[in-house]
Amino acid sequence: MEKEEQSYRKSKNIVGIIQSCLILILIVLIIFIMVNISRLQGTARVINYAGMVRGATQREVKLEITENQNDELIKYLDDIFLGLRYQDGHYDLVKLKDKEYHDKLQILSDYWEELKKEIKAVREAGYQNTDIVNMSEIYFKMADETVSAAESYSERIAVKIRTLELLSVLDMLCLVILIVIQTLAAMKMSVLNKLLEQRAYTDA
């Protein structure tokens, strides 16, 4: 009986240590999940505004071709680029930690500056005497690639969140199993103690 008590105490201590480790791991996993969810929410705004850049630029080009100048729309696009590249401006945009996206955004931003020069040329000489249509098509493809890069980054975060959630579930399952094992061991020990008491009473 004494050996069983020692074995029970030893196993209880081991289970307690494992439980503490699993709880600590669970806390860390939950923190990582929260951080990645926050990143995912910020990424959604970036994707939205990157898509708006694509659409708004096409609209600006069409307006210029039809001789409807819109400097406010150009300023609006400039502000979005400031937000996307430097997290400046009024749009509360986050910086995506993805090199491919930033490389494509840099190329797109540089090409936007060239496109603005071409818009100025359209106003001075008419769109027939410029390369505005071809440039806008190239720009659209660049913008599409930039949005795709942001979407790929977003998907990677989503996959990471799903993986962390799965690990959290497994962690909690292990905790439940340990609690069940601990409960069964305690019940077994309780039964043994009662049997010992009964024997002691009978012997007396």
Residue spans for each PLM region:
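Extracytoplasmic ligand-binding sensor domains of the Cache superfamily
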Residues: 63-121
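Short, Lys/Arg-rich, polar N-terminal cytosolic tail immediately upstream
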Residues: 1-9
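Extracytoplasmic
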Residues: 47, 52, 56-65, 103-162
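Membrane-proximal amphipathic alpha-helices
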Residues: 35, 39-50, 69-70
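Extreme N-terminal signal-anchor transmembrane helix of membrane signaling/transducer proteins, especially
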Residues: 9-36, 169, 173-176
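Alpha-helical transmembrane signal-anchor helices
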Residues: 159-192
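Membrane-interface helix-start motif
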Residues: 9-15, 150-169
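Amphipathic HAMP/coiled-coil signal-transducing linker helices
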Residues: 191-204
